[in-house]
Amino acid sequence: HVDSRSRRKQTDVYFYNTGSRASRNLTNTMKNVFQRKYAHHQPGRGFRGTVSKRDLFVLRNTTPVAAFIELGNIQNKYDQQRIVLSNNRQALANWISETFVIDYKNYKKK
């Protein structure tokens, strides 16, 4: 999901969960992966992401563990680059995929 808010927020990415332990773990892992990747690829820039519970239809009505991610404000020219540039889209997809692998491995340990 791409955030369509008109005003620039200082948050880079919003990670929403259902409130269940598994969903919270997944979104916290996502935030940690993104934070680590931002530190590596954009040192000194910092990363601001938030994890919170949201009562969204798509989260409530999904059987597997779910997360909803807002990647930016489409009306902001800097955030647009996350979506418009194919390398950026691929990086985001890779980071999200990495999160699922980490989350799965953590789940198997339990």
Predicted regions and their residues:
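Active-site-proximal helix/loop segments of hydrolytic enzymes
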Residues: H1-K110
